[in-house]
Amino acid sequence: MTPKTKTKTKTKTKTKTQMKMKLAAITLDCPDPPALAEFYQQATGFEPHPKSDAEFAALNREDGLLLGFQRVDDYRAPQWPDQTVPQQAHMCFDVPDLDEAEARLLELGAGKPDHQPHDPTRARVLTDPAGHPFCICRRG
């Protein structure tokens, strides 16, 4: 009698390489691109894009992300949390100190809606001068 041997068959599964996208830009509609760019430049420290103008202004982050602001005729600010004019998108920024960041942003021209859906020790909702809501969140 000969011993039975198991034959192992290697099966190669071909996996399709998934295309990975890198976020290159975030652009917000607004009535005054240079003014909104100035607000976010002071808030974030991002560098102004050299080709900014009255129709489209932008800021560059060190890693290449562009934060853009495009002029829209008859712009209507989001009415958050009301959905009459929905927000459509919002950004979140990590900050080391919520109270300090909030005070600074309000001084720069941000607004603070009455409706605050988060634990105020973790995150707060503010609005930029064009009415876009954004969050500041405590790191960690």
Where are these regions (language model features)?
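A short, structured beta-strand/loop element
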Residues: F69-R71
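Amphipathic alpha-helical segments
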Residues: D32-E47, A101, L105-L108
